[in-house]
Amino acid sequence: MVKKEKTPSPYTKPLDGGWGWMVVLHFFLVNVFVMGMTKTFAIFFVVFQEEFEGTSEQIGWIGSIMSSLRFSAGPLAAIICDVLGEKATSILGTFLVSGGYVISSWATGIPFLCVTMGLLPGLGSAFLYQVAAVVITKYFKKRLGLSTAIARSGMGLTFLLAPFTKFLIDLYDWTGALILFGAIILNLVPSSMLLRPIHSQSNNNSDIENKGSILSATEPEASYKTETSKCKETQEPFIKDSTMKKSEQPTTTLTVLGNQSEEFSNRPHRNRPLLMSNGKSHKKKFVSWNCKQKLLDISLFRNPFFYIFTWSFLLSQLAYFIPTFHLVARAKTLGIDVMDASYLVSVAGITETVSQLISGWIADQNWIKKYQYHKSYLILCGVTNLLAPLATTFPLLMAYTILFAIFAGGYLALILPVLVDLSKNSRVHKFLGYASFFAGIAVLSGPPIAGWIYDYTQTYTGSFYFSGTCYILSSVSLFFVPLAERWKRKQSDLLRTTIK
């Protein structure tokens, strides 16, 4: 007889507060020290042009490598997290960013800086950001939107870091400024120690990664308890070949633990359910097959929700940086003073920060599903950018800037909560890592594409049209979420029928 029970779990409810706010503090500092300083690269851009007499294209590669690696190194960050754990990975990322800035102070050329200020900080940023993002999902559920928005608001302090960076360069030269930046970022080492591990077991077990169910006897010792993050050698009991006589085989009650996935019936024999007879199991030591597959898990590519999220994430990241980079340049072509144009950037930063906080709080009220908010914000961003060429005066440009910052802040605050909802809170590391890899390609190619459009048309209106189109297209995949949910339910029903 087979009977179903819910997964016995030692800890299933996120704290939604308590020590979780310390994790939010760490995530906030990551956004301030790492992401905020990345945005101040424009100041070093001018300095490097004068120091090394390089072209804009050559020096632009430094910033492009740094920005794109924060996303495209996501799969590597996921693997490192599985091997070392979140806390060690975060500390490693801190040393990479800090060391990259310090070594850059001895730079002798642009290729040198591409490695020390592009590659190293880019990898470190990926490690820091992904670890903080994943750990915060373990501590928060009901308040995930608000907690993420508070953490991301650190990026809004860029308008304060820009004059601070200029002050350091004027006072200590660019070499001294880089050394000080490296020292400041080292504060993330004690901050990373706040990432207290939390061991939980949900219905969608993260270690098992939905690769199948576990069948066990009703004895407590048969429960399968997992530890998040680290991939270790484990001993798994499995059924031993035997020639028991029929009369010697007693009736066994089996308990189905957890939610089963559609992949259950296709798993190899060594990954089949754990069967126990008479409350006793025949055990043999071997290295966990799950652990071997953990470092290179391609099962995500059979998950429709992964494609839905990745399509939306890729195109929205492709679109986001284009108006950000070209806003001031477009204002200059309209005859607006550079100082007035710089106010647009400051207003955008402040508005986006406030918008993220409000968006996160609204999403946590669960009036509608979070991806519905996300989809609406993306569409509004697209419409706003498609109408941007109509803004030909400073007041109209200011109105466009405020509207775009409101809608952009709205969807940026919901990227992580939507990811958690679509991934069903399982394999968040891998889900975010692989999706970020494709987003990194978009970040690397977006500004050059927009630049090519300007070179071809000699106007920035084409860049805003391109951005608006990408935003509209990024929302399309989210319309397929209900279809994917129905498909998932059919697969679950079919699996339950097969087990019965």
From Swiss-Prot:
<comment type="function">
    <text>Proton-linked monocarboxylate transporter. Catalyzes the rapid transport across the plasma membrane of many monocarboxylates such as lactate, pyruvate, branched-chain oxo acids derived from leucine, valine and isoleucine, and the ketone bodies acetoacetate, beta-hydroxybutyrate and acetate.</text>
</comment>
<feature type="topological domain" description="Cytoplasmic">
    <location>
        <begin position="417"/>
        <end position="430"/>
    </location>
</feature>
<feature type="topological domain" description="Cytoplasmic">
    <location>
        <begin position="364"/>
        <end position="374"/>
    </location>
</feature>
<feature type="topological domain" description="Extracellular">
    <location>
        <position position="109"/>
    </location>
</feature>
<feature type="topological domain" description="Extracellular">
    <location>
        <begin position="326"/>
        <end position="342"/>
    </location>
</feature>
<keyword id="KW-0472">Membrane</keyword>
<dbReference type="Pfam" id="PF07690">
    <property type="entry name" value="MFS_1"/>
</dbReference>
<feature type="transmembrane region" description="Helical">
    <location>
        <begin position="17"/>
        <end position="37"/>
    </location>
</feature>
<dbReference type="GO" id="GO:0005886">
    <property type="term" value="C:plasma membrane"/>
</dbReference>
<keyword id="KW-0812">Transmembrane</keyword>
<comment type="similarity">
    <text>Belongs to the major facilitator superfamily. Monocarboxylate porter (TC 2.A.1.13) family.</text>
</comment>
<feature type="transmembrane region" description="Helical">
    <location>
        <begin position="88"/>
        <end position="108"/>
    </location>
</feature>
<feature type="topological domain" description="Cytoplasmic">
    <location>
        <begin position="485"/>
        <end position="500"/>
    </location>
</feature>
<feature type="transmembrane region" description="Helical">
    <location>
        <begin position="110"/>
        <end position="129"/>
    </location>
</feature>
<keyword id="KW-1003">Cell membrane</keyword>
<feature type="transmembrane region" description="Helical">
    <location>
        <begin position="343"/>
        <end position="363"/>
    </location>
</feature>
<keyword id="KW-1133">Transmembrane helix</keyword>
<feature type="transmembrane region" description="Helical">
    <location>
        <begin position="176"/>
        <end position="195"/>
    </location>
</feature>
<feature type="topological domain" description="Cytoplasmic">
    <location>
        <begin position="130"/>
        <end position="153"/>
    </location>
</feature>
<feature type="topological domain" description="Extracellular">
    <location>
        <begin position="38"/>
        <end position="58"/>
    </location>
</feature>
<feature type="topological domain" description="Cytoplasmic">
    <location>
        <begin position="1"/>
        <end position="16"/>
    </location>
</feature>
<dbReference type="InterPro" id="IPR036259">
    <property type="entry name" value="MFS_trans_sf"/>
</dbReference>
<feature type="topological domain" description="Cytoplasmic">
    <location>
        <begin position="80"/>
        <end position="87"/>
    </location>
</feature>
<keyword id="KW-0813">Transport</keyword>
<dbReference type="InterPro" id="IPR050327">
    <property type="entry name" value="Proton-linked_MCT"/>
</dbReference>
<feature type="topological domain" description="Extracellular">
    <location>
        <position position="175"/>
    </location>
</feature>
<feature type="transmembrane region" description="Helical">
    <location>
        <begin position="464"/>
        <end position="484"/>
    </location>
</feature>
<feature type="topological domain" description="Extracellular">
    <location>
        <begin position="452"/>
        <end position="463"/>
    </location>
</feature>
<dbReference type="InterPro" id="IPR020846">
    <property type="entry name" value="MFS_dom"/>
</dbReference>
<protein>
    <recommendedName>
        <fullName>Monocarboxylate transporter 5</fullName>
    </recommendedName>
</protein>
<feature type="transmembrane region" description="Helical">
    <location>
        <begin position="397"/>
        <end position="416"/>
    </location>
</feature>
<dbReference type="InterPro" id="IPR011701">
    <property type="entry name" value="MFS"/>
</dbReference>
<feature type="transmembrane region" description="Helical">
    <location>
        <begin position="431"/>
        <end position="451"/>
    </location>
</feature>
<feature type="transmembrane region" description="Helical">
    <location>
        <begin position="154"/>
        <end position="174"/>
    </location>
</feature>
<feature type="transmembrane region" description="Helical">
    <location>
        <begin position="305"/>
        <end position="325"/>
    </location>
</feature>
<keyword id="KW-0769">Symport</keyword>
<feature type="transmembrane region" description="Helical">
    <location>
        <begin position="375"/>
        <end position="395"/>
    </location>
</feature>
<dbReference type="GO" id="GO:0015293">
    <property type="term" value="F:symporter activity"/>
</dbReference>
<feature type="topological domain" description="Cytoplasmic">
    <location>
        <begin position="196"/>
        <end position="304"/>
    </location>
</feature>
<feature type="transmembrane region" description="Helical">
    <location>
        <begin position="59"/>
        <end position="79"/>
    </location>
</feature>
<feature type="topological domain" description="Extracellular">
    <location>
        <position position="396"/>
    </location>
</feature>
